[in-house]
Amino acid sequence: MSWFTGASLAAGSLVDMAGTISSIVAQQRQIDLMAEANRIQADWVRRQEALQIRGQDISRDLAVNGTAQRVESLVNAGFTPVDARRLAGGTETVSYGLLDRPILQRGILSGITETRHLQAMQGALSAFKNGASYGAPPAPSGFVNPNYQPSPPRLKLGPRPPSTNV
């Protein structure tokens, strides 16, 4: 029976040794998996940091150049530079007479012409009220010239028609 006991003990030792070896292999596999997970996590952290830096760069760029880029894209979309600035938050106005012109694309604006009739009428009324800033200057003091008459100008229409006493 001693050989059976020795064989059983040897088999038990072999099973224990196989269990220890499989445990060591499993632990090594677990270590490899943890190292892979750590590598993936480190890569994820690097990418997140790069995304945050890129986001900060974009925020800074938009804070500095955002309005200019918006205006440029609106001009490229077909708006006039003034209308693009108005759409981007500018306070400029475009008046046709006493009315503010709405924001329109260039294609629509090509059919609208600005006549400036109201400005011409306002200029004429101002000239009647205040006088014109052009023309002959007032006569210098002590200078006598028939072209410098203090009387208002006269309109000569031609010879007088004959008069009759009927």
UniProtKB/Swiss-Prot annotation:
Belongs to the vesivirus VP2 protein family. Translated by a ribosomal termination-reinitiation process from the bicistronic mRNA coding for VP1 and VP2. Residues 149-166 have a biased composition (Pro residues). InterPro entries: Minor_structural_calicivir. Pfam families: Calici_MSP. Coiled coil: none annotated. The keyword Translocase does not apply. It is found in: Virion; Host cytoplasm. Residues 138-166 are annotated as: Disordered. GO terms for cellular component: host cell cytoplasm; viral capsid, decoration. The N-terminus domain points away from the virion surface. Keywords: Capsid decoration protein, Capsid protein, Host cytoplasm, Virion. It comes from Sapporo virus (isolate GII/Human/Thailand/Mc10/2000) (Hu/SaV/Mc10/2000/Thailand). Its main location: virion. Homooligomer. The portal-like structure consists in 12 copies of VP2. Interacts with capsid protein VP1. Minor structural protein that forms a portal-like structure at a unique three-fold axis of symmetry, following binding to the host receptor. The channel formed by VP2 may allow the delivery of the viral genome through the host endosomal membrane. This is Minor capsid protein VP2.
